[in-house]
UniProtKB/Swiss-Prot annotation:
Gene Ontology biological process terms, A to Z: actin filament depolymerization; defense response
UniProt protein name: Actin-depolymerizing factor 2
Main localisation: cytoplasm
Segments forming domain ADF-H: 5-137
Gene that this sequence comes from: ADF2
Location of Phosphoserine modifications: 6
Organism: Arabidopsis thaliana
Additional record remark: Plants silencing ADF2 show net stabilization of F-actin that blocks cell maturation and root-knot nematode development and reproduction.
Length: 137
């Protein structure tokens, strides 16, 4: 199904991998990219993948959509997790790509039922672990 604003389709695998992450916690991260006018799964991060490895894997000059299953401990010492959606749009990305990702984001997010927190990041500091922790309340 294409988005009228951007003409983007969403590959079925995008939703299937997200549901798998949500239900079975098979992955820690999912990185999506737009290719040939559709959103596709670019790579999956194993449950053991560290946050630093995930952040380092994002391209420095290209946009991506990401899902990150963030584990944390509450003030009451309870283990919890929240599913973050990250719109990665680095300052060095091409303007046209930033526009395509921005115009397709809401439509794509609607396909992924269960996102709990959304972040917009243009550089790694905007999606640091401290930012994740501050958004878990």
């Amino acid at each position: 199904m294409a988005n009228a604003a951007s003409g983007m389709a969403v590959h079925d695998d995008c939703k299937l991998k997200f549901m798998e992450l949500k239900a079975k916690r098979t992955f820690r991260t999912i990185v999506y990219k737009i290719e040939d006018k559709q959103v596709i799964v670019e790579k999956l991060g194993e449950p053991e993948q560290s946050y630093d490895d995930f952040a380092a894997s994002l391209p420095a000059d290209d946009c991506r959509y990401c899902i990150y299953d963030f584990d944390f401990v509450t003030a009451e010492n309870c283990q919890k997790s929240k599913i973050f959606f990250i719109a990665w749009s680095p300052d060095t990305a091409k303007v046209r790509d930033k526009m395509i990702y921005a115009s397709s984001k809401d439509r794509f997010k609607r396909e992924l039922d269960g996102i709990q927190v959304e972040l917009q990041a243009t550089d790694p500091t905007e999606m640091g672990l401290d930012v994740f922790k501050s958004r878990t309340n």
